[in-house]
C-alpha cells in the first residue's frame, strides 16, 4: 500500500513556486491521484458552505440507491411539508406541491440549478422527514472523518450552526465522486427536465460558469461539482480538473463578488479556482521517486547465515512535485518492524515502511518488502530457542526446583550414608569385645 500524507501547500512549496495569491476565506487544492495537498489556506476553519451542502445531500441519495432503498426512475411527489419554509428568492427549479418527478430529475434540479426544494423533497422521501435526514447528514459526515462540520438543513440555507470546512468538503466530495452518477449529474452544463403533471419541460442551466462554454470563466479542463453563495457565506465552489495526467480537486470558500472599473461583475470563486488550476498545471508534474523494483535499503537479519536482506517498495512512489524540483532534497526515512529481522523471511514479506518528506512535511509512505527469501539456520534457531527457554520465568523456576531437589536428595544421601557408617561401627565393635574372654 502507498499511503500519501498531507502536505501543506504554501509552506512546503515556499521558494520553489510562486504563491498564487488566493484571497478567499479558505481554499484547498488536492491531487486526487495521490491525495497530497498542493495548496491550503485555512482549510480547517469552520465556514458557511451555502449550497455546497447539496453535495452531501446528493451523496446520501446515491447511497440510498446503492442500498436498494431508492431508484433513479422512482417517482416522488413534492409534499407541502417538504416545501414549507423555503424562501421564494432562493435558488429553485420551480417545483410545486403535488408535482411528480423522478429521483433522477430531482438530482439534476438539485445539482445543476441548485434547487433548494429538490433537496428537501429528496430528504423527506429518504428519511421520512427533513429533520431525520439532517441527522443522517451529520452522522455520515462523522463517518467520513469530518471534524469541523455540522448541518442544519439539506440545502444550505444560512444558520449559525450550519457550517463545514474546506477539508471536510473535500472528504465529502471524494466520497460522492465514487459514484459515477454524481459526476454525470453535476457536470451537466444544462439539462432538460421532461414535462410533469404540473409543468411543461424546463431547461436547467448549470450555476457553475467554469463548465459552461460561452461564459467568461469557461475552462474545458474543469468538471462539476457545485456552486454555493449567500450573503454570509460569500461565493463558494467545489470542482475537479484534469489536464495531461493530472487530476485535481479544488475547494473555495468565502470568495468575493466585485465590480471592476468597467462595471463588470467578477465572481472570485470562479476566478480563484481557475487561477489555482492553471498555477498547478504550470508549476507541478508527477515525478517517480521509487520504482517498484528499486532497492530501497537493507534490513539486518538474525537466525541466518545471511546477515541482511534487500528491501523494495510495495509499489512505485510517484509524487506531484514542483517542476525542476531537486529530488536530492527529499528525505527518505526507513522504519523497520523489527531490528534485526528474524529469519525465515519470504520474498514479499512486509518488513517496514519508508516515509518520503520535503522540508519536514510528509509527502508519502510506502511499505517495504523483502526483495528475496532468506532461510533460517537450524542451529541458530535451536540455540535461540534454548536461550529463550532458560530465560523465561517458568524455566528459571523449574531449574530452581531441580537444584533444590538435588540439594535435598544430596543431603538425604549424605545423612543416610553417615548413619550406616555409625551403625556398622557399633555392631562390629560389640562382636569383637564379646569374643575376647582372656
Predicted regions: what is each one?
Residues 1-8, 297, 323:
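Intrinsically disordered, low-complexity repeat and linker tracts
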Residues 3-167, 171-180:
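Active-site-adjacent loops and short helices of periplasmic peptidoglycan-processing enzymes
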Residues 8-21, 419-425, 430, 434-435:
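Short, charged, intrinsically disordered terminal tails
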Residues 146-150, 158-163, 167-405, 409-425, ...:
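Domain-terminus/edge residues, biased toward the C-terminal soluble/receptor-binding domains
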